[in-house]
C-alpha cells in the first residue's frame, strides 16, 4: 500500500483493474467463420417467420437462411445482427445460421478490420 493512499482507495483501484480485465476476457476469443467449411459472415436483412431469415452474405448474395433447432430457442436473432452462415452445398441460395455475434463482438470485429467492406455496417 502506498503511503499517500488509504486502504479503501487502494481496494477501489484493485476492483477497477479487475473489472477492466473481466471486460477484456469477456470478448476473449471471438469466433470467426471457418472458410474450409464454407462458412461466411452475413447481416440479417429481414425476418421472414418460421425460423427463416434473409441474410446478406459477404460474397454479395442474399440467401434464405434458417435457424437450426439447436439454436432456435437459445439464441434470439434480430434484423441487422451479424451472423455466421453456411450455404447449402446442393442449393447455394439457401444457408444455415451457425453463430450470432453480440453487438460488442460485432463492433470489435469492425474496429479491428476483420469484417469485409460489403457487410461492415458497424463503422
Curated annotation (Swiss-Prot):
Residues 1-11 have a biased composition (Acidic residues). PROSITE patterns: IF1A (PS01262), S1_IF1_TYPE (PS50832). InterPro entries: NA-bd_OB-fold, RNA-binding_domain_S1_IF1, TIF_eIF-1A, TIF_eIF-1A_CS. SUPFAM superfamilies: Nucleic acid-binding proteins. It comes from the Archaea. Keywords: Initiation factor, Protein biosynthesis. GO terms for molecular function: RNA binding; translation initiation factor activity. It holds the Pfam family eIF-1a. Residues 1-26 are annotated as: Disordered. SMART domains: eIF1a (SM00652). Residues 28-102 form the S1-like domain. Seems to be required for maximal rate of protein biosynthesis. Enhances ribosome dissociation into subunits and stabilizes the binding of the initiator Met-tRNA(I) to 40 S ribosomal subunits. Belongs to the eIF-1A family. NCBIfam families: eIF-1A, PRK04012.1-3, PRK04012.1-5. This is Translation initiation factor 1A. The gene is eIF1A.
